[in-house]
């Protein structure tokens, strides 16, 4: 699909061919107040009051997400008009805008419309600009048109009728709207990569596959890449990481991707993604029900790859490093056992009380490795704990950080990106739950506050830099009839990096 911008100076009556230009459909928003403005006023005038008559007849009440198609409209170049309800104007929030936009796209996608002029981006969303609205509209459309069929014997190769979308914006917003198009497409491409990797089965998306994906990404976008194997990981003395992988026949990989968009000596932001390509729980075996979904335990790694792809496509002016420890967690005769004690790269000894708390074991060595980059900030992303799902459900990702400024940046980015996160506590008192009689630290702290103690464990390895942890166990994928990876938290991470690059 091709996205472009057309500027119209409504205040001066300059529509830049808006009414007469070739288009299969013009999308117009109507509030419950039924007051017409901007593009709607122009169309109403050109059609001799058609919109006014439709509204007065009660065919469009303006309620959020309601849609009405008008066919063979006289006086304009488009063959039809789609009216979309926007709800109450004084309550037109980010969420309501998203609901209205998705309703519009669903209506359009149910037709054979090939070219659309889209004016909903002009509607005044509270605390958001029209360029934000453009990007959100692109992401909504790409989300609705995403499909994963490559593992079927006959993949769906059909194409959508919709080919071209023109966003109509005020002349003053044209420059930023064009930037928003670039960002929206880049973000959607990054999310698609993240979703594709998550949706692949564990026998395809292995650690080696993730390593090869990183190499291809580096080649396509001129990134620097290193993919370390078993012997190199052993040489780095990553005993905690190796303890997780030793029960699997799949070799582990330690992936390091570097994007250089800023000054050569500028401190990078480091993203660390958990890459367990299949998690059985190891000797602490998981229940069989829904174990197939443990292919999604690499979604943290997938989000790092997707974010780096988006960052490279946007050409952001900062440096970013992606670190991905990736392996399987399998039971075997040589697998790590509950009660085993391993030594991390940092030198801390860890008593493995539960082999199904493996994500923190691979992340802690990656967080130690991150020190060599002298980072401006480190964010780890992991489908870490079921406890986070119990606490927050499937709407908010869990955010943990002792750095208030960094946490604030991430929360602001989550709101801007419509990719919500909620900050959870990281008080020192929780560390007591991780005490071990036999090692420096235990890898679990019991059932109470499970997501918090997991973050506390990771915090022991992050003292050298500002750090935040995102637990995406509840947000990285959906179950049931809509089963599939969501691409989150790529929007949050990308927005955080966009904001950092602008500083």
From Swiss-Prot:
Binding site for Mn(2+) 1: 279, 356, 358
Cofactor section: Mn(2+)
EC identifiers of the protein: 3.4.11.1, 3.4.11.10
GO cellular component, one term: cytoplasm
Family indicated by similarity: Belongs to the peptidase M17 family.
Function: Presumably involved in the processing and regular turnover of intracellular proteins. Catalyzes the removal of unsubstituted N-terminal amino acids from various peptides.
Active site: 286, 360
The reaction(s) this protein catalyses: Release of an N-terminal amino acid, Xaa-|-Yaa-, in which Xaa is preferably Leu, but may be other amino acids including Pro although not Arg or Lys, and Yaa may be Pro. Amino acid amides and methyl esters are also readily hydrolyzed, but rates on arylamides are exceedingly low; Release of an N-terminal amino acid, preferentially leucine, but not glutamic or aspartic acids
Keywords: Aminopeptidase, Cytoplasm, Hydrolase, Manganese, Metal-binding, Protease
Gene Ontology MF terms in the entry: manganese ion binding; metalloaminopeptidase activity
HAMAP family the UniProt entry points to: Cytosol_peptidase_M17
UniProt GO BP: proteolysis
Cofactor remark from the record: Binds 2 manganese ions per subunit.
UniProt protein name: Probable cytosol aminopeptidase
Positions of Mn(2+) 2 binding: 274, 279, 297, 358
CDD domains named in the record: Peptidase_M17
Keyword Hydrolase assigned: yes
Subcellular location: Cytoplasm
Principal location class: cytoplasm
SUPFAM superfamilies associated with the record: Macro domain-like, Zn-dependent exopeptidases
Organism this protein belongs to: Paraburkholderia phymatum (strain DSM 17167 / CIP 108236 / LMG 21445 / STM815) (Burkholderia phymatum)
Leading EC class: hydrolase
């Amino acid at each position: 699909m091709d996205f472009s911008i057309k500027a119209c100076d409504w205040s001066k009556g300059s529509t830049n061919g808006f009414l007469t230009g070739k288009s299969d459909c013009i999308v117009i928003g109507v509030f419950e107040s039924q007051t017409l403005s901007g593009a709607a006023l122009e169309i109403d005038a050109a059609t001799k009051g058609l919109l006014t008559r439709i509204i007065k007849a009660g065919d469009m009440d303006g309620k959020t997400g309601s849609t009405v198609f008008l066919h063979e409209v006289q006086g304009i170049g488009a063959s039809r008009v789609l009216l979309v309800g926007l709800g109450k104007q004084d309550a037109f929030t980010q969420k309501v805008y998203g609901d209205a936009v998705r309703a519009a796209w669903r209506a359009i996608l149910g037709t054979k419309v090939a070219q659309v002029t889209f004016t909903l981006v002009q509607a005044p969303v509270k605390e958001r600009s029209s360029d934000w609205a453009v990007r959100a509209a692109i992401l909504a459309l790409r989300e609705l048109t995403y499909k994963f069929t490559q593992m079927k014997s006959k993949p769906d190769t059909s194409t959508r009728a919709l080919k071209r979308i023109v966003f109509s914006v005020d002349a003053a917003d044209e420059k930023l709207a064009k930037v928003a198009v670039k960002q929206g497409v880049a973000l959607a491409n990054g999310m698609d990569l993240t979703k594709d990797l998550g949706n692949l089965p564990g026998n395809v998306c292995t650690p080696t596959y993730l390593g090869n994906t990183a190499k291809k990404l580096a080649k396509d976008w001129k990134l620097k890449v290193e993919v370390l194997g078993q012997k190199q990981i052993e040489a780095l003395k990553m005993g905690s990481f190796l303890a997780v992988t030793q029960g699997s026949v799949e070799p582990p990989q330690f992936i390091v991707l570097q994007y250089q968009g800023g000054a050569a000596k500028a401190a990078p932001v480091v993203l660390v993604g958990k890459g367990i390509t299949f998690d059985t729980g190891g000797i602490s075996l998981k229940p069989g029900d829904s174990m197939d979904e443990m292919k999604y335990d690499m979604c943290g790694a997938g989000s790092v790859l997707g974010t780096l792809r988006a960052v490279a496509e946007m050409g952001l002016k900062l440096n970013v490093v992606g670190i991905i420890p990736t392996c399987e967690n399998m039971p075997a005769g040589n697998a790590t056992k509950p009660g085993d004690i391993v030594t991390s790269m940092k030198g801390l000894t860890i008593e493995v009380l539960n082999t199904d708390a493996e994500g923190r074991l691979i992340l802690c060595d990656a967080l130690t490795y991150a020190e060599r980059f002298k980072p401006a900030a480190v964010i780890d992303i992991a489908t870490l704990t079921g406890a986070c799902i119990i606490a927050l459900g499937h709407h908010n990702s869990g955010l943990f950080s002792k750095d208030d400024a960094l946490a604030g940046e991430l929360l602001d980015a989550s709101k801007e990106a419509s990719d919500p996160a909620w900050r959870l506590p990281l008080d020192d008192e929780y560390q007591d739950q991780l005490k071990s009689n036999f090692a420096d630290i235990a890898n679990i702290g019991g059932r109470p506050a499970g997501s918090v103690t997991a973050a506390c464990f990771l915090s022991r390895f992050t003292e050298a830099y500002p750090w935040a942890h995102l637990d995406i166990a509840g947000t990285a994928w959906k179950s049931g009839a809509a089963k599939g990876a969501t691409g989150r938290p790529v929007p949050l991470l990308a927005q955080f990096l966009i904001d950092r690059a602008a500083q």
